[in-house]
Every structure is written in structure tokens, then in C-alpha cells.
Curated annotation (Swiss-Prot):
Disulfide bonds: none annotated. Keywords: Acetylation, Actin capping, Actin-binding, Cytoplasm, Cytoskeleton, Phosphoprotein. It holds the Pfam family F_actin_cap_B. This is F-actin-capping protein subunit beta. GO terms for biological process: actin polymerization or depolymerization; barbed-end actin filament capping; cell morphogenesis; cytoskeleton organization; lamellipodium assembly; negative regulation of filopodium assembly; regulation of cell morphogenesis; regulation of lamellipodium assembly. The modification N6-acetyllysine is found at residue 264. Component of the F-actin capping complex, composed of a heterodimer of an alpha and a beta subunit. Subunit of dynactin, a multiprotein complex part of a tripartite complex with dynein and a adapter, such as BICDL1, BICD2 or HOOK3. The dynactin complex is built around ACTR1A/ACTB filament and consists of an actin-related filament composed of a shoulder domain, a pointed end and a barbed end. Its length is defined by its flexible shoulder domain. The soulder is composed of 2 DCTN1 subunits, 4 DCTN2 and 2 DCTN3. SUPFAM superfamilies: Subunits of heterodimeric actin filament capping protein Capz. InterPro entries: CapZ_alpha/beta, CapZ_alpha/beta_2, CAPZB, CAPZB_N, F-actin_capping_bsu_CS. One of its GO terms (molecular function) is actin binding. It comes from the Eukaryota.
Length: 301
């Protein structure tokens, strides 16, 4: 692991702000171009190898360390809360130094006395959100692990909803779904409405290894954003509003992955490999052409 990874004080998804830097012209342009190329490369590499590829890129260009770590989402890792005996997910949003906070017990592991904590009001909301998304995960994914972390902002709060579902390798199929939903909530002065900004990233990979078709890897990541104003009331609290946004976003991303990415891959594979013999395929094409010609003649009459 690269030495700079443990020293970063900011989350992986936050944006770095450059203050008081001099304009070095060509050097700055070259650095920006290197970062663009590195990010473009990471988008095209398998999600299950993100950590290794990210480490290799940082070793090649150490000056991009902070920019890459703040821009590239990494697969979620699972830890066990020894206090309550439940699993939770690790990310930079529940990390303080080398310790990670569990959403279930609100304790850091390894123990940390002065670790960052949400306010009492937000902690209560965090507990309710974890219970709600635990049920959501069980209904939609039938397993896996989920975690929700919230933190205070000046005019509202922000949070991250994490969901991870890994395949068990049965039927010679391996895979993993990692979704990271970062939401920012700006509460209006009236207290009756709020502005929600959601940024969602899904990393998905599948690997099959069957004697009939051989080994096939398929994976990628997709990021989408949306903003929406919602009414806040007893009938429609923050958790319900955020839950609907996350549910709609995951359905859209899942549909996009299924129809575009997997559908396109299926078309490509079917174009390269066919279960039909060439003779049968030629007969089918000839029959289709005959039907088209017959319909044209019928329309002309």
C-alpha cells in the first residue's frame, strides 16, 4: 500500500481545492493531462482490480496520489462490530486516522477517544436510516451488507449509503455489486422542504468459468447525479425522501447496466459466436428475405 494513503484527512469522493498556487503554465497543463488520462484508464479497467491498478498508477506518478485517491471510488470492505456482532462497511466517511466507526454501536475500531461523531439529533437519524436500509438491502439484494453514515453541515447534513453484495461462487459464477450513494441535504429555513443532491456510483463485475463457454469477465462502474426538492413532514421524513431517491437511482442504474452494457455485450458475443451452423443461418436469412419481398409485393398490389 502506498504510504500516502493513511495520511489523507479528506474523504475519497471530496474535491480538492487549490489555494494560493502559482501558475506554472506547461507543468500544470501536463499534470492535468496526466490526471485525465489516469482517470480515463481507471474507468476502463476491471472494478475487481481497482486497488492494484490504483497503487500501480500512484507508483508510476506519485504526484497524482492525492488527486487519484480523492477521485477514484474503491470496492467496499467489510468489518465486524464485536460489540453487537454485526457486519458494517468501511470507507473514508467513517474513518478517523486508522480507526473506523461502526454505525451499529457508534464505536471506533481500534478504539479512538476523540473520534469524529455526529450530533445527537443526527445520530438518532443515522440509527433509523441504518435500520431502514438494512430492510431495503434484504428485500432488493437478499443478502449482503449495508451501512449508512451521516455528518453535520452548516445548513443541513450529508450522508453516505453503502451497499455491498458479493456472489457466493455457486454455479461457477462469481461477482460483486458495490453501490455508494452520497447525499447532501440542505434544509430550508421554513423547515417544511429540503433540497437533496444525490451522487451515486455502482461498481459491478461478473466472472463465469464454465467448461462449455470458458472464462468470461464482465465489469464496469457507472456514476449518476440528481437533485430534487422534497417536502419534509411526519408522513415524509428525511429517511423516506432519501430512500425513494436511492431506490429510483439504483433502479435506473440497474436498468442501464442491464439494457445497454449487458445487452450490448450479448449482441457482440452473439455476433462472434453462434449456436447455429452456417448453413442453418443462411437458410434463416434467406427465409427472412423472402418474407420481406412477399410483404413488399403485397403492399404494392
Amino acid at each position: 500500500m502506498h504510504p500516502c494513503r493513511r495520511s489523507l484527512p479528506f474523504p475519497l469522493n471530496c474535491q480538492l481545492v487549490k489555494v494560493g498556487t502559482a501558475d506554472y503554465g506547461g507543468a500544470s497543463d501536463q499534470s492535468d493531462q496526466q490526471l485525465d488520462c489516469a482517470l480515463d484508464l481507471m474507468r476502463r479497467l476491471p472494478p475487481q482490480q481497482i486497488e492494484k491498478n490504483l497503487s500501480d498508477l500512484i507508483d508510476l506518478v506519485p504526484s497524482l496520489c492525492e488527486d487519484l485517491l480523492s477521485s477514484v471510488d474503491q470496492p467496499l470492505k467489510i468489518a465486524r462490530d464485536k460489540v453487537v456482532g454485526k457486519d458494517y462497511l468501511l470507507c473514508d466517511y467513517n474513518r478517523d486516522g486508522d480507526s473506523y466507526r461502526s454505525p451499529w454501536s457508534n464505536k471506533y475500531d481500534p478504539p479512538l477517544e476523540d473520534g469524529a461523531m455526529p450530533s445527537a439529533r443526527l445520530r438518532k437519524l443515522e440509527v433509523e436510516a441504518n435500520n431502514a436500509f438494512d430492510q431495503y438491502r434484504d428485500l432488493y439484494f437478499e443478502g449482503g451488507v449495508s451501512s449508512v453514515y451521516l455528518w453535520d453541515l452548516d445548513h443541513g447534513f450529508a450522508g453516505v449509503i453503502l451497499i455491498k453484495k458479493a456472489g457466493d461462487g455457486s454455479k461457477k459464477i462469481k461477482g460483486c455489486w458495490d453501490s455508494i450513494h452520497v447525499v447532501e441535504v440542505q434544509e430550508k429555513s421554513s423547515g417544511r422542504t429540503a433540497h437533496y443532491k444525490l451522487t451515486s456510483t455502482v461498481m459491478l463485475w461478473l466472472q463465469t468459468n464454465k467448461s462449455g463457454s470458458g472464462t468470461m469477465n464482465l465489469g464496469g462502474s457507472l456514476t449518476r447525479q440528481m437533485e430534487k426538492d422534497e417536502t419534509v413532514s411526519d408522513c415524509s421524513p428525511h429517511i423516506a425522501n432519501i430512500g425513494r431517491l436511492v431506490e429510483d437511482m439504483e433502479n435506473k442504474i440497474r436498468s442501464t447496466l442491464n439494457e445497454i452494457y449487458f445487452g450490448k455485450t450479448k449482441d457482440i458475443v452473439n455476433g462472434l459466436r453462434s449456436v447455429q451452423t452456417f448453413a442453418d443461418k443462411s437458410k434463416q436469412e434467406a427465409l427472412k428475405n423472402d418474407l420481406v419481398e412477399a410483404l413488399k409485393r403485397k403492399q404494392q398490389c
